């Protein structure tokens, strides 16, 4: 895990709230528009990967 990223409070696919650090972060935006930031997280219990929206002020 990269140490430069801060943990985000997300809801895992299992339905639990967890503070996780995204493994990958990218912006999802149509051309010329603001868009949203998406993070790739790994569920600590099941080991499955899932995506979740990040706050707008999150560094990429």
Curated annotation (Swiss-Prot):
Q: Does the keyword Cytoplasm apply?
A: yes
Which Gene3D superfamilies does the entry mention?
Answer: Chromatin protein Cren7 (2.30.30.610)
Xref: Pfam families: Cren7 (PF11520)
* UniProt entry keywords in alphabetical sequence: Chromosome, Cytoplasm, DNA-binding, Methylation
A single GO cellular-component term on record: cytoplasm
Is the keyword Membrane assigned to this protein? no
Main localization is cytoplasm
The entry's comment on post-translational modification says: Methylated at multiple sites, to varying extents.
* GO MF term set: double-stranded DNA binding
Localization, UniProt: Chromosome; Cytoplasm
N6-methyllysine modification sites?
Answer: 16
Subunit: Monomer.
Task: State the family named in the UniProt similarity comment for this chain.
Answer: Belongs to the Cren7 family.
Q: Tell me, in a sentence or two, what this protein's role is.
A: A highly abundant chromatin protein, it binds double-stranded DNA without sequence specificity; there is approximately 1 Cren7 molecule for 10-12 bp of DNA. Constrains negative DNA supercoils. Induces DNA compaction and mediates intermolecular DNA bridging. Binding does not require protein methylation. Binds single-stranded DNA weakly. Increases DNA stability against thermal denaturation. Promotes formation of loose nucleoprotein structures with long DNA in the presence of albA proteins.
UniProt name for this protein: Chromatin protein Cren7
Query: Which source organism does the UniProt entry give?
Result: Saccharolobus solfataricus (strain ATCC 35092 / DSM 1617 / JCM 11322 / P2)
Q: Mind giving the lineage of the organism this protein is from?
A: Archaea, Thermoproteota, Thermoprotei, Sulfolobales, Sulfolobaceae
The gene it comes from is creN7
């Amino acid at each position: 895990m990269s140490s430069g990223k801060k943990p985000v409070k997300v809801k895992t696919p299992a339905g639990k709230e967890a503070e996780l650090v995204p493994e990958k972060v990218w912006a999802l935006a149509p051309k010329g528009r603001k868009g949203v930031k998406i993070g790739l997280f790994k569920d600590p219990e099941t080991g499955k990967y899932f995506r979740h929206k990040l706050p707008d002020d999150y560094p990429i």
